[in-house]
Amino acid sequence: MTPELRHMLRDDDLNHEEQKQVLELAIKFHHDRFYKQPFAGPQAVAVLFDKPSTRTRSSFSIGVAELGGYPLVIDKSGSQLGRGEPVADTARVLNRMAYGVVWRTFGQGRVEEMAKYSTHPVVNALTDDFHPCQILADFQTIAEHRGGVDNLKNQTIAYLGDAANNMANSYLLGGAVAGMDVRVAGPYGYLPRPDIVADAKRVAAETGGSILVTTDAKEAVKDADCVFTDTWVSMGEEAEYAIRSKPFWDYQVNTELMALAKPDALFQHCLPAYRGKEVTAEVIDGPQSVVWDEAENRLHAQKALLTWLTGKARGDESLLA
């Protein structure tokens, strides 16, 4: 197998078969947390944070350690990136020390520049535009509740709320890669960028999926297999909550809206959740909610992704399955 440097910067960086490989590997890690250990020595993976995190920080820190590596966790305040050092310079330094870079930051262009200058895999752990690691965990959760990865193609998923945010973008692209029927609903002024919708439709045409963007929450949820939402206010916008939340009340996931989905529909939320706002307590704490499985699967999905990317970079086929 020829070594091939690959990155995970947005959800369509994996094709349909590659996404299946990663998800199958994630399920294996769920059954055996030490299924594979691609890092030895231990070899370091740089885990950089420009934004606060609970799930991303804990899952990548624990995950890299369980893969046999050393998670070099650096916050913005502890990095020269936080003082304006060029991304390219940071990448060149980390090339000499680390075996991969995981970065939770703001602009998508920052992780893309890191990848441009990196000689090791770079993983987008969240940007303003995309959250691909979360989507892998979400799809792993669906697969585990629906009889396997092959059944993802049969799923209809609905995302409600701020449809212009990173989660909506990633559901569009990641769902298209999986061959799902993806529905995204939000109010006018909070819909996905046309270029992302166009990319999702192009991929869906290749995989047999479909894309629907609408302002009608009921249309999106009708007969859906899984319903997703996210906080209405992203990090850094908390002071604007009263103003920003006004357009979203019709998209609150409650028992009435869930009743329009299939009777066995799942509910997922990437967390943190605000009960009584984007979702009611009856739903997130109810029998259809799988949010804690979803949160745990961040660990397994990210370990699978790092293992797969490392296998590609080393030309080691044994790490791909």
Curated annotation (Swiss-Prot):
<dbReference type="GO" id="GO:0006526">
    <property type="term" value="P:L-arginine biosynthetic process"/>
</dbReference>
<dbReference type="GO" id="GO:0004585">
    <property type="term" value="F:ornithine carbamoyltransferase activity"/>
</dbReference>
<dbReference type="InterPro" id="IPR002292">
    <property type="entry name" value="Orn/put_carbamltrans"/>
</dbReference>
<feature type="binding site">
    <location>
        <begin position="53"/>
        <end position="56"/>
    </location>
    <ligand>
        <name>carbamoyl phosphate</name>
    </ligand>
</feature>
<feature type="binding site">
    <location>
        <begin position="131"/>
        <end position="134"/>
    </location>
    <ligand>
        <name>carbamoyl phosphate</name>
    </ligand>
</feature>
<dbReference type="GO" id="GO:0016597">
    <property type="term" value="F:amino acid binding"/>
</dbReference>
<comment type="pathway">
    <text>Amino-acid biosynthesis; L-arginine biosynthesis; L-arginine from L-ornithine and carbamoyl phosphate: step 1/3.</text>
</comment>
<feature type="binding site">
    <location>
        <position position="166"/>
    </location>
    <ligand>
        <name>L-ornithine</name>
    </ligand>
</feature>
<keyword id="KW-0028">Amino-acid biosynthesis</keyword>
<dbReference type="GO" id="GO:0005737">
    <property type="term" value="C:cytoplasm"/>
</dbReference>
<feature type="binding site">
    <location>
        <position position="230"/>
    </location>
    <ligand>
        <name>L-ornithine</name>
    </ligand>
</feature>
<feature type="binding site">
    <location>
        <position position="80"/>
    </location>
    <ligand>
        <name>carbamoyl phosphate</name>
    </ligand>
</feature>
<keyword id="KW-0055">Arginine biosynthesis</keyword>
<feature type="binding site">
    <location>
        <position position="298"/>
    </location>
    <ligand>
        <name>carbamoyl phosphate</name>
    </ligand>
</feature>
<feature type="binding site">
    <location>
        <position position="104"/>
    </location>
    <ligand>
        <name>carbamoyl phosphate</name>
    </ligand>
</feature>
<dbReference type="GO" id="GO:0042450">
    <property type="term" value="P:arginine biosynthetic process via ornithine"/>
</dbReference>
<dbReference type="InterPro" id="IPR006132">
    <property type="entry name" value="Asp/Orn_carbamoyltranf_P-bd"/>
</dbReference>
<dbReference type="InterPro" id="IPR006131">
    <property type="entry name" value="Asp_carbamoyltransf_Asp/Orn-bd"/>
</dbReference>
<feature type="binding site">
    <location>
        <begin position="270"/>
        <end position="271"/>
    </location>
    <ligand>
        <name>carbamoyl phosphate</name>
    </ligand>
</feature>
<comment type="similarity">
    <text>Belongs to the aspartate/ornithine carbamoyltransferase superfamily. OTCase family.</text>
</comment>
<keyword id="KW-0963">Cytoplasm</keyword>
<keyword id="KW-0808">Transferase</keyword>
<dbReference type="Pfam" id="PF00185">
    <property type="entry name" value="OTCace"/>
</dbReference>
<dbReference type="Pfam" id="PF02729">
    <property type="entry name" value="OTCace_N"/>
</dbReference>
<dbReference type="InterPro" id="IPR024904">
    <property type="entry name" value="OTCase_ArgI"/>
</dbReference>
<comment type="function">
    <text>Reversibly catalyzes the transfer of the carbamoyl group from carbamoyl phosphate (CP) to the N(epsilon) atom of ornithine (ORN) to produce L-citrulline.</text>
</comment>
<feature type="binding site">
    <location>
        <begin position="234"/>
        <end position="235"/>
    </location>
    <ligand>
        <name>L-ornithine</name>
    </ligand>
</feature>
<dbReference type="GO" id="GO:0019240">
    <property type="term" value="P:citrulline biosynthetic process"/>
</dbReference>
<dbReference type="InterPro" id="IPR036901">
    <property type="entry name" value="Asp/Orn_carbamoylTrfase_sf"/>
</dbReference>
<protein>
    <recommendedName>
        <fullName>Ornithine carbamoyltransferase</fullName>
        <ecNumber>2.1.3.3</ecNumber>
    </recommendedName>
</protein>
<dbReference type="InterPro" id="IPR006130">
    <property type="entry name" value="Asp/Orn_carbamoylTrfase"/>
</dbReference>
